[in-house]
Amino acid sequence: MAKEKEKLFSEFPPVSREAWIDKITADLKGVPFEKKLVWRTNEGFNVNPFYRREDIEDLKTTTSLPDEYPYVRSTRMHNEWLVRQDIVVGDNVAEANEKALDLLNKGVDSLGFYLKKVHINVDTLAALLKDIELTAVELNFNCCITRAADLLSAFSAYVKKVGADPNKCHGSVSYDPFKKQLVRGVSNPDWVKMTLPVMDAARELPAFRVLNVNAVNLSDAGAFITQELGYALAWGAELLDKLTDAGYKPEEIASRIKFNFGIGSNYFMEIAKFRAARWLWAQIVGSYGDQYKNETAKIHQHATTSMWNKTVFDAHVNLLRTQTETMSAAIAGVDSITVLPFDVTYQQSDDFSERIARNQQLLLKEECHFDKVIDPSAGSYYIETLTNSIGEEAWKLFLSVEDAGGFTQAAETASIQKAVNASNIKRHQSVATRREIFLGTNQFPNFTEVAGDKITLAQGEHDCNCVKSIEPLNFSRGASEFEALRLATEKSGKTPVVFMLTIGNLAMRLARSQFSSNFFGCAGYKLIDNLGFKSVEEGVDAALAAKADIVVLCSSDDEYAEYAPAAFDYLAGRAEFVVAGAPACMADLEAKGIRNYVHVKSNVLETLRAFNDKFGIR
């Protein structure tokens, strides 16, 4: 008996795709599921409500193993990513060193140093890296691109001075030859000439990556996932193309490239993006010859939680955003991760927020053991399909950039910047209409929060004194317009009072008063909700007694034909009158002079801006 294999599911016959579709259609009362349940993404492909085994049988990404070309599943036989935390190095280099040593004792194994206004030489690096074992931690340096070669030379000299093995010194210098065009809006057609000294200075540091594909800037500017990946591939391919023409071998260049991606809030798509990046980059490097379909074709991916979806208001929600973002990058098998502190949008992060950010990664390692499993999403019908769909769309974009003359041409003509900025505008429109939700900002705001006093960080950190000759990326965060709206209310010294005139059908009046409170709360208005009134006259009198600036009628569609005209006439222009909903009788109500409505199809941002203008809040 012990050897008999019990067939637990023998009584359940396989269910065909057609049977599933018939059942779904029946549940939708005859409406084709394509109209209701198919997600038409911004990435250029549709996502179905269910997938089956046959959906992945012919996919190119399901046959390889981890650490096997084309490396879809992983570039290594483990998932021990590095926990990175960055340090801004100011005038006090010793203080930065003290902080670095403290971080190393708290679980960090990758350090990032932002060198600002620091004289770069061996002595400076000696002070900065004092007591740090160079071969035991990844060291990443960020400085002006004009100082990258000097930094590499100084670091190489320091490695020799302390007797460390340069082959075991891992890290990077954030040399990005396209930052001028993309971020600063300044032409840089001779970037190859600038790059050669950087490559030469790195020769004695074979494990250092000095060519950065900073696709995170695209993510922070609101790029769609396929744009971030497609342009990143074209970016990396341009480095390979132009530097091989300059005399370097493909393996010399590929081993120097580091891809810095952003991590957005689209959980499953982000997992698929990193998997697709490994696959497609391996294809690009492998196209130089079969001899490169090995270690040379392995992508090196660093991931940073995106700034685009982070908020000033209800900032602790940023913790939820960064946690799921970190999970997607860890599951996808990136090489290292930076989690931005939750307060990064409004102040210089403090010890508390940095500790929380650091522990978000350590939690996934020490408590959840994400580092013990390689590519757990492999075999998922959904994620395997997403990997292919994202890969195909990104590849199309990559080819279009190549056909148009390559990444340099695209950056110099600002075609990349314009495309990403158009996506930024589209996403802002989605935020304005709540198709893209920012919890605590454009939906379910904290009514009593005041944020103006806590903002100490100057906005526009990507600006410089350069004279722009081409269009740069627009780094306005998704929540920025709602934040500006609410901050204007705070600074005006006048807080409009919104009074909910609830009457009639109990369920509908409660639902609409809650909806309207969340609607007007996004502008920081004072909200007065009510249990209900016996008549519109009673409600209007109570509103005027409360010195309401806006009176919102909350009832059912069927009752608006009676209540709305009566309330509007009795109010007699003593406050703004709003109907919560879009009733069938709207045309009749408009004919009687009722112009203001709030409902699920409203442009929340534009509606609230209009009210701010009426109250002189700018």
Curated annotation (Swiss-Prot):
The UniProt record lists the keyword Isomerase: yes
Pathway(s) where this gene product acts: Metabolic intermediate metabolism; propanoyl-CoA degradation; succinyl-CoA from propanoyl-CoA: step 3/3
Enzyme Commission (EC) number: 5.4.99.2
Cofactor requirements of the protein: adenosylcob(III)alamin
Coiled-coil regions listed: none
Catalytic activity annotation: (R)-methylmalonyl-CoA = succinyl-CoA
Keyword Repeat in annotation: no
Keywords for the protein's UniProt record, in alphabetical order: Cobalamin, Cobalt, Isomerase
SUPFAM superfamilies on file: Cobalamin (vitamin B12)-binding domain, Cobalamin (vitamin B12)-dependent enzymes
Recorded superkingdom: Bacteria
Pfam families membership: MM_CoA_mutase
GO biological process per UniProt: lactate fermentation to propionate and acetate
Molecular function GO labels: cobalamin binding; metal ion binding; methylmalonyl-CoA mutase activity
Residue stretches spanning the membrane: none
Gene3D superfamilies documented for this protein: Cobalamin-binding domain, Methylmalonyl-CoA mutase
Entry similarity comment: Belongs to the methylmalonyl-CoA mutase family.
Role this protein plays: Catalyzes the isomerization of succinyl-CoA to methylmalonyl-CoA during synthesis of propionate from tricarboxylic acid-cycle intermediates.
Subunit structure: Heterodimer of an alpha and a beta chain.
The protein's name in its UniProt record: Methylmalonyl-CoA mutase small subunit
Organism per entry: Porphyromonas gingivalis (strain ATCC BAA-308 / W83)
